[in-house]
Structures are given as C-alpha cells and as structure tokens.
From Swiss-Prot:
Gene source species: Mesorhizobium japonicum (strain LMG 29417 / CECT 9101 / MAFF 303099)
Annotated S-S bridges: none
Molecular function GO terms recorded: ATP binding; dTMP kinase activity
Catalytic activity annotation: dTMP + ATP = dTDP + ADP
The protein's role, per its UniProt record: Phosphorylation of dTMP to form dTDP in both de novo and salvage pathways of dTTP synthesis.
Alphabetic keyword roster: ATP-binding, Kinase, Nucleotide biosynthesis, Nucleotide-binding, Transferase
Protein name: Thymidylate kinase
Pfam assignment, any one: Thymidylate_kin
Species lineage: Bacteria, Pseudomonadati, Pseudomonadota, Alphaproteobacteria, Hyphomicrobiales
Classification via PANTHER family: THYMIDYLATE KINASE, UMP-CMP KINASE 2, MITOCHONDRIAL
Top-tier EC class: transferase
Record's keyword annotation contains Protein transport: no
Length: 224
C-alpha cells in the first residue's frame, strides 16, 4: 500500500488556518480523497485529555518547560494513535498545528533551550515529519482583531491569545524563519487576503503537491 501524505497548518492567532483546513478537507472529501482532519493539542483521546490543561493556562504556573513536556506527551500519543496509522494506510492527514507551533510557542517565545526542544521533538514525533506545512502569515494586530471578532468578546480568549502584541510579533517572525530554513517543506500563505482568495491559494498548493507525488507513486507501484 502506498504511503499517505501528512500536511500541517501553522500560524499565529487569528490567521484563519482552522477555517482553511476545514474548507480543504471538505473539498478533498468531495473529490473522494481519503482524508483525516485532526488538530493539536488534541486529536487522540489521550491528547484531548491534556488539551484543556494547556489552553486554560492551568499548566502555566509550572513554567514553559513543563508545558513543553505536556505538549510533547500529547503529541506522542496523537502521532502513534492517529497520525502514523492513517499515513501508513494511505490517508491524507490534515493537522491543525503540529511541531512548528511547539518550536515557536514554547521554544522561541517560551525561552526553552533549543537542544531540549529538539530532543523533545524527536521523542514526540518519532520520525513522523510533515510532508508539507502551510504557514499562514498575518500581521499579529490584525490576527488578534479577527480572533476577537470571531469570539464576539475577549471572554473566550485562551491563554496564548491573551499574551502581549510583542510576543505575537516574535512568533510571527519565528514562523517565517522556519519557512525560510525549510523551503522544501514549508509554504507561506498570505492570510491577510479574503478567505476565498486564501482558499484558492491553499487548494492550488496542496493539489500541486499531490500531483507531483503521483508519478513517483506510480513508478513505485510499477513492476520491475
């Protein structure tokens, strides 16, 4: 059986990645692709149990290193219980946030030692790197404004959305640095455009990547 394809959606608050991943999933289902839509933190029963602790801020008093450990534990369960089995059976996995969010949120703005983060990452993903990552880029002030409009008030903001604008700006820079360092995996999407325009960009990028894989998959399946 041919291996599937693992695509992650990344970006700052209010960039619209969750809207776009749902739109892409619907479009791919309509085209009869075997698609699994998932998210982080969460995505598996074990990881979902950790999700509330992380987003509510309950883990914040223990410091960024403990928070990073919790994210890694949740990710390991998610990878082994959901993502890896789906990719191995040939599915296309669409994941709302993955390792790049930890690199940025805990590693860069959390101030955790890069070597520690790299070790955690290796343990958590155990070789399950994304084949493609879409990084949704938007000015943090606009992203936070959109996030507030989406919720209707500041009352429902999670602990990450409540952080200072300077921190959000540092995260934007960190995501763009990842994209620049790994251009073979990452595509930066201008998330400031209207949702339909962004959808067109995402659709074109993903289907181009899938079509580029098709000849290789056909060669792999051909008799020798």
């Amino acid at each position: 059986m041919a291996r599937g394809f693992f695509i992650t959606f990344e970006g700052g608050e209010g960039a619209g990645k969750s809207t776009q991943i749902e739109r892409l999933a619907r479009k791919m289902h309509a085209k009869k692709y075997d698609v699994l839509l998932t998210r982080e933190p969460g995505g598996s029963p074990g990881a979902e149990a950790v999700r509330h602790v992380l987003l509510s801020g309950a883990a914040e008093p223990f410091g960024p290193k403990m928070e990073a450990l919790l994210f890694a534990a949740a990710r390991s369960d998610h990878v082994e219980q959901v993502i890896r089995p789906a990719v191995e059976r040939g599915s296309i996995v669409l994941c709302d946030r993955f390792l790049d969010s930890s690199r940025v949120y805990q590693g860069v703005t959390g101030g955790i030692d890069p070597a520690f983060m790299a070790t955690l990452e290796q343990i958590a993903i155990n070789g399950m790197m994304p084949d493609m990552t879409l990084i949704f880029d938007i000015d943090p002030a606009e992203g936070l404004r959109r996030a507030t409009l989406r919720r209707g008030s500041d009352a429902g903001a999670d602990r990450f959305e409540k952080e200072t604008l300077a921190i959000h700006q540092a995260r934007r820079a960190a995501f763009l640095a990842i994209a620049a360092a790994e251009p073979e995996r990452c595509i930066v999407v201008d998330a400031s455009a209207d949702p339909n325009t962004v959808e067109d960009v995402v659709t074109a990028a993903v289907f181009a990547a899938l079509e580029a894989r098709a000849p290789a998959r056909n060669r792999q399946a051909a008799p020798v």
